[in-house]
């Protein structure tokens, strides 16, 4: 963060890298409170995201918590390009139709083909990448569960422009989303292993234990 004093807007602010402008007649208390408000906002955001991961791992909730931070629509898809979650604003604005899932809960074909063509997309691409679509910057990063590709996160900067400081923030957020998706995959993998065990037990003609019966009924 850079705090400048003077009688005119500093040139660096025009670059779009900074989101806080303090006017020349602000006193020290106002400046201090403004800085604290910024830190409080990001601290509350981080705590809310981590609490969500620890409890429900609700990806949709994580996206809604993050809209005030990025001020742009966010989409999370799985390894087969099916939607896991997307920002609620996408359904409220017709100009965001391209980011809505189609009838198969997948990306619109036109946007998907553009993404694949313009970024040379590959599931092995671990570093974040940017693409330009209709003059707007789109941040994209793949998600992994260990070494396994499990999806992708995209933030389309169509409401406010992409700033230099957004890159590290997007990467940090993507790691938290990755933790949530990985947790859901771990739960799913555990259920699959349990069901396989129960199926083999039934094939052998062995009675199920009370715990196995309870698992099947839930």
Task: Please annotate each region the language model reported.
Residues 1-218:
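Hydrophobic, helix-rich cores of sensory/ligand-binding and other regulatory modules
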